Amino acid sequence: MTCPVLELAEELIRRESVTPNDAGCLTVIGTRLERLGFQLERIDRQGVSNLWATFGQQGPMLCFAGHTDVVPTGDLKEWSSDPFIPTVTQDGYLRGRGAADMKSSLAAMVVACEEFLEQRPNPAGRISFLLTSDEEGPATDGTVAVVEELEKRQAAASEPAIDYCIVGEPSSKDTLGDVVRVGRRGSLNAFITVHGTQGHVAYPELVDNPIHGASRLIADLVGTDWDDEPNDYFPPTSFQVSNINAGTGATNVVPGTTAFRCNWRFSTSTTAERIEAMVEQLIDTLGMEASIEWNLSGEPFLTTHGTLTSATAKVIKAQTGIETDLSTGGGTSDGRFIAKLGCELIELGPINRSIHKIDEEVKIDDLLRLKDLYKGLMTKLIG
């Protein structure tokens, strides 16, 4: 017996689509969608491949979102088999780069649409796909580019809004469907340089040690409460230092500068602007000279309990018997960009235990189950 989800997942894994190379994955998917009657549009930018595909003319829109790109393989010698030759293992897994993150989700989405539209050729709502080859890398010309175009069109009333979005990121922890992401923390990065006065360590009155200054600043940053108020959905905002650089290499020289990189993972209880202002205030209070380079890599988003989360919990319970955990844990995803469109958004995909690792794999039985979950959500939301 053939398994169409497995076959499509294998076809996608064979394509060496390391960011930002799509390697023809969108053509494979687009061909399948076009046969169903989808209207296809490529919104490529700066060498990144992006696909926007739509079906239907009326009713609420359910969007499937994801990425065709994968992370590098690492040392090929460590793999049990070629990462771009899909391998079915004896214990029932599909192995290959992208098997879990997230070519299996893409295959499940496409096949779910095929089966759904075969049974309901005229659904009560619309379906769309937003796919990119730039999620694992800089993520500056992928989903961002499509969202920017959709924002322009929606402002001009030339494009209908997305009502519900399912991102196929591998959200599950131990069993398919046990965790569904309903939000993600924002991520703010800073490169802070503390300026002092270089000199000989034997003459402290003639130097201003920036290492000491940076240490005081870091201690204050660690001890700061960054949130306006407690949040029922997210943990408190976290601050972490990831790199520190200082010194000339000599033991008798106080350096002129100390630089460190740091990151805030923040919830909807604060904003990047508020964090930046608080840091500037701390520096002023300490009376030090410092320069800062800021980089906001993602705003936080949250889908509160509503139509999509309710439907998702019910479909998972009906098909698997699991009471799913609606979570905001984990890192960032392209959901942070799509959420700007104002839609209800979740992330639902396979078990994430092996993502980005050697011998990445997904349970073959889960491919069928995931397809059925996606199909069940289409039936409940736009059927």
Predicted feature locations:
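Acidic/His- and Gly-rich active-site-bordering loop/insert found
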Residues: 1-99, 117-124
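Catalytic metal-binding/acid-base residues of hydrolase active sites
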Residues: 18, 69, 78, 136, ...
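Short beta-strand segments
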Residues: 65-67, 130-132, 165-169, 193-195, ...
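Short, conserved micro-motifs enriched in small and acidic residues
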Residues: 94-107, 120, 208-211, 361-368
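Acidic/histidine-rich catalytic neighborhood of metal-dependent amide-processing enzymes
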Residues: 102-183, 382
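Metal-dependent amide/peptide-bond hydrolase catalytic core
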Residues: 170-175, 182, 188-383
